[in-house]
Amino acid sequence: FKASEKYNVNYHLIKAVIKAESNFNPQAVSRTGARGLMQLMPKTAYALQVKDSFEPEENIEGGVRYLRYLLNLFDGDLYLALAAYNAGENAVIHYRGIPPYSETRTYVQRVLRFYQEYSKETKTSIPGTHSTN
């Protein structure tokens, strides 16, 4: 993905988010109205100047730019950035951590699992995560 280099977000992380969000379906629409590969909400897409959320390159560009913003906001903490991608940055700020929503907690674990699987393919370490041992 071009956006990987442009926004300095690991390619495998982008792929993991897409897998968790839409299972690689560019026409995906969630029950809450999120659209496209990275499941951008209409207001988020508008704020990111994404005109067509169903256009894969444009959706990925916007989604990765948003993910970079969240990583910066939460000082590179991947867990918090992913939680915010799913539940919204205000929820993460309000709870001062991953919100107690089962959907969000499951989402973070799913993305991290996919990220680990994709990273193993090229033996890439996962920056911004904490040891769970």
Q: In which residue ranges do the predicted regions lie?
A:
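Catalytic glycan-binding domains that act on GlcNAc-containing polysaccharides
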Residues: 1-133
